[in-house]
Amino acid sequence: MAKQAAKSQDNTTRWIVVAMVLLVIVTGVVFSLFGQNSKETGSISALDGYKLKPAVTSTIDTENGSAITFDNGPVTTIDVWEDPQCPVCKFFEDANGEYLESLIREKKATVRFHVLSFLGDESVRAANASFCAADEGQFLDFHKAIYAVQSQVENSGFWSNDTLVKMGQKIGITSPTFESCVKNGSKVD
């Protein structure tokens, strides 16, 4: 009788282990299928049909960490610290970007974007291109475009100077000055 109880307990344990393994596999498959972002990223085709909004003048505020600054006078100041490749920064932009842009365009806040490059060389190129777009008065649109096409893999080779120039062109930044600035790394310090 003891042998039969032990055998029954072994079978129960075996079934519990099999069920747990299957649960892990099914969970993995579900997250793999449904956890992917349905929006195309890592491709500038996500910018098809994008229209530039009116230019907004910004300055480079070297006293506050070389921030791209939209100074709207003595009102609330918001500092945004970000890296173009940072996935959490993309989440922040997706959640707050339109609100920040409305504060800027309606002159309700001074917003300073500190575009950093803590995730590698591709971040340096994308940050440089962001400053080049700011020189054209089109930082807000370029900033939005960067996060719209952000690759899901950091330092994937996506952020080449050619891709950054094409992104600018795709959204309407077509000046030779922008292209030259991006390709020459003119804003890299």
List each model region and its residues.
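Extracytoplasmic thiol/disulfide redox context detector
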Residues: A2-L119
